[in-house]
Amino acid sequence: MTNADMELDARGLNCPLPILRAKKSINELSPGQVLRIVATDPGSVKDFEAFSKQTGNELLESTEENGEFVYLIKKAGG
């Protein structure tokens, strides 16, 4: 598992809030750093896949365990 440089707790938030919060958090990172997001919205799976494609950031990991969805996104650039 990759270590995250920043964590975002998006549990209990519904679309589009997890993506909006992730976008804000990613903007605070330097290129190459990793954001770990924990969400409970099942729709976030497709949202984060699309978010990564649109922004050029790399979705390193997408897992689901006990109703929680965990994403690791590496900021593009650098």
Regions of interest found by a model, annotated:
Residues 49-78:
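C-terminal structural segments of small proteins and small subunits
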Residues 16-60:
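Amphipathic, hydrophobic secondary-structure cores in small proteins
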